[in-house]
Amino acid sequence: MLYNINKRLYLFEKGREEMAEVNVKKSSFFKEKKEVPNTDFSLLKGALIQNLDRLEKFVEAIPYKYIKEGNVKENA
């Protein structure tokens, strides 16, 4: 019976050590992320340009009631 208690205490302490190690790894991971700022906006710029191009194509495909290609209907 004493063996079982000692074994449980050992496993409990080992589990606490492993949890502490995991917590240290997690905290160091987040600290590393905060220390290195990401200032590369080239991917964002590329995505925005691509979305603008898609929007322009979409708008060009819409048939206008008063404005057609080359002709502008004026109110007299």
From Swiss-Prot:
The GO annotation for biological process reads: sporulation resulting in formation of a cellular spore
Q: Which domain of life is it from?
A: Bacteria
* Keyword annotations: Sporulation, Toxin-antitoxin system
Q: What does this protein do?
A: Antitoxin component of a type II toxin-antitoxin (TA) system. Antitoxin that binds toxin SpoIISA and neutralizes its toxic activity.
Q: Which family does the entry's similarity section mention?
A: Belongs to the SpoIISB antitoxin family.
| Assembly information from the UniProt record | Probably forms a complex with SpoIISA neutralizing its toxic activity.
Record-given protein name: Stage II sporulation protein SB
Give the classification, highest ranks: Bacteria, Bacillati, Bacillota, Bacilli, Bacillales
Give the gene symbol: spoIISB
